[in-house]
Amino acid sequence: MQIQPILAALRKHRLATILIAMEIALACAVLCNACFMIANRVSSMQIVSGVDESSLGFISLSGFDPKIAVDLNARVIAGLSAIPGVQSVHVINSVPFGPQAGNSGIELDQAAKHSDGVVEFYQGGPGTPEALGLQLVAGHMPVSDDYQLLDGYFPKSPQVLITRALAEHLWPGQDPLGKEFWSYATYFRVIGVVAHLAIQQYNEEGQRGAQWTFFVPAQPGGFLSGNYLIHANPQDLNRVMVAARAAIAKVAPNVVLDRDSSHTVSFLRHRFFQTDRAMAGILIGVIAALLLVTALGIVGLASFWVQQRRRQIGIRRAIGATRGDILRYFQIENFLIVTGGIVLGMLLAYGLNLVLMRHYELPRLPLYYLPIGALVLWGLGQLAVLGPALRAAAVPPVVATRSV
C-alpha cells in the first residue's frame, strides 16, 4: 500500500493529526521518565543490607547522663538477655535503616590534602559483627584485643572491618588488608573485608556510596551506649521486641525509650522504603491513566474518521479493495501518526530528564528507555485503532456508496 495517499489524507485533517501526535509525544516523555523513576525506586528498595535482618531487633534509649553509661549498658544487657528467646544482646551505635549515628570524611593521607569521600561507620561491642551476620570475604573478624575503650568518638588506632565496595573505592584492584586511612586525627587499619554493610540512611542520589561503611570494634561506654542490638530466632523476634520494651521500663525506668526507632530491622527497612513504594504506585497509576487517555483519543479519532469516510470506504470496496486493504490503511495511518508523536516525544523525554536531573538529582535517562517507550506506544496505537479499523473493513460496499 502506498504511503502518499495516506499522508495526503492526513494533511486534510492537520489539526486532529497534530493533537493526537502531541498527545502521544507527551505520553512518550512521561512514560520513559516515569518508568525510569520506578526502576530507580525498585532498585533502591533491593539494596543488600549485609545483616541478618529477620533475626535482629534494635532498642534505642535517650535522656540519660553519660556518666552512668557503663552502668546503664550493664543493666539493659542483663535485662534484655533474660528475655526467653534472646540469643545475645550487644551495644551498637545503629543498624541499617535505623537512625543515623555516625558519618565521617576519610582520607588516605594524614595531611588530609585530598578527601576520599564521606562514609558511615558502625561501632559495636564484642560479638557484634557475628550477631549482625556480616559475611567476611577477606581477613578476620575483630578479636578481644581489638575492642578498645573510646578516646572521644573512636578508640585509639582502631582495627576495623570495611565493606568490599569501600575497599574497591579506596584501593581499586589492591589488597586492602593492612591498609590505613584517616579521619581527622584518628587512623584506622583494615583487618577484614565484609561483603556488604549498608549505610544507615540510604539516600536517592544513587547506590554508588550505599555500601561505603566500616565497622569499629569498641568497648561499650561513653558515646557507645543507649543503643542495643538484639539477636533472636526469627519466629521469636516480634515477641521478644514486645518483651524488650516492657523490660526497659523495669531495668531503666528513668530513661526515654525511642519507640520510633526501637523495632525489628525488618520493620525498619519496610518503613524506610514506604515512601518509595508509594511513589512507585503513584507513578504506575499516572502511566496507566496516561496510556488510557491516549488510547481513548486514538479510538475516538479513528472512529470519527471511519464515520466521516464511509462513502470513500465504500467506493474503494466497490472498485476491488479488500477488507484487509481497508484494515491496513487505518493501521498504517495510525502508525505514521504515532511515529511522528514518538519522534517528538523522545526529544521531550530527554528534555524532561534534564529538568529532573537539575532539580531532583535524578540520574541521566538511559537511552534504552526510548525504544522501549516507542514499542509500547506503537503497540498501544495498533490495539486502539484495531476496533475502528475492523468496523471500517466491515462496511458493505453497497451501503457505503448509498450514504451521503
Question: What are these model-predicted stretches?
Answer:
Residues K12-A39, T275-R311, T339-G340, L344, ...:
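Hydrophobic alpha-helical transmembrane segments of multi-pass inner-membrane transport and secretion
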Residues L26-S54, M357:
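Alpha-helical transmembrane segments
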Residues Q4-R11, L15, L296-I337, A394-S403:
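Intracellular coupling helices
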Residues S43-D71:
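Membrane-interface junction motifs in transport/secretion proteins
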Residues L290, R311-M357, I372, V376, ...:
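Transmembrane alpha-helical interface segments in multi-pass membrane proteins
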Residues M1, A8, K12, A16, ...:
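Membrane-helix entry/capping segments
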Residues A82-S88, S94-F272:
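Mid-to-C-terminal secondary-structure elements
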Residues Q2-I3, A374-V404:
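C-terminal membrane-exit region of the final transmembrane helix in multipass inner-membrane proteins
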